[in-house]
Regions:
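Generic structural signal for well-ordered alpha-helical scaffold segments
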Residues: 80, 84-92, 112
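Short glycine/proline- and acidic residue-enriched helix-loop micro-motifs
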Residues: 58-78
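Phosphate-coordination/substrate-recognition cap region in phosphate-metabolizing enzymes
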Residues: 1-59
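Acidic, low-complexity terminal tails and accessory targeting/binding regions
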Residues: 1-2, 38-50, 92-98, 113-160
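Beta-strand elements within well-structured catalytic alpha/beta cores of enzymes
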Residues: 97-103, 107
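Short beta-strand scaffold positions
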Residues: 8-9, 81, 102-103
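Active-site signature of alpha/beta-hydrolase-fold catalytic machinery across serine-
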Residues: 20, 110-114
């Protein structure tokens, strides 16, 4: 089957993608704040190289622990709690339906780690490219399976 419901982060970069998919599929579109990207605080909009130059000790600590937050931002532990609450709610509300979640790197990594029962620090070991796809099957009795992660095959097809 096709997509039953599209759920997007309300941030513009996700919303634009979700709007395009909704137009193409006719699926209803919902926004969920739980799917918003990590708030990187003072690091927002900077590259990791720029951040590392200005805050070397904080970056080092942040890259070692999900409990460390960027200055003025959210820790990954906080994001994990927020994303898991959104996933719990969405899975309960949309059982037996096919959802397309349009989100950002951190929430997608968190969903994949949850599906694989992987520890939180696994977030630091997953690479996700822009506009990549991740497919996760969630089952009513609890377990989940990651069917694909960081799939970018559609991007090369789109460029032809």
């Amino acid at each position: 089957g096709g997509i039953d419901v599209i759920v997007t982060s309300p941030l513009r970069r996700a919303r634009q993608t979700a709007d395009a998919v909704a137009r193409a599929t006719g699926a209803p579109l919902l926004a969920d704040d739980g799917l918003i990207e990590t708030d990187f605080g003072k690091w927002e909009g900077m590259t990791i190289a720029e951040v590392s130059q200005r805050w070397p000790d904080q970056v080092s600590a942040w890259m070692r622990s999900v409990d460390v937050a960027p200055p003025g931002g959210e820790s990954f532990a906080d994001v994990i709690s927020r994303v898991n609450a959104a996933l719990d709610r969405l899975l309960a509300e949309h059982q037996f339906r096919t959802l397309l979640l349009v989100s950002h790197v951190s929430p997608i990594k968190i969903a994949a780690c949850r599906a694989m029962l992987a520890p939180p620090a696994t977030l630091f070991r997953i690479q996700l490219d822009v506009a990549s796809l991740c497919e996760i099957g969630w089952f009513a009795d609890g377990p989940a399976v990651v069917r694909s992660l960081n799939d970018t095959a559609h991007l090369s097809r789109a460029g032809r």
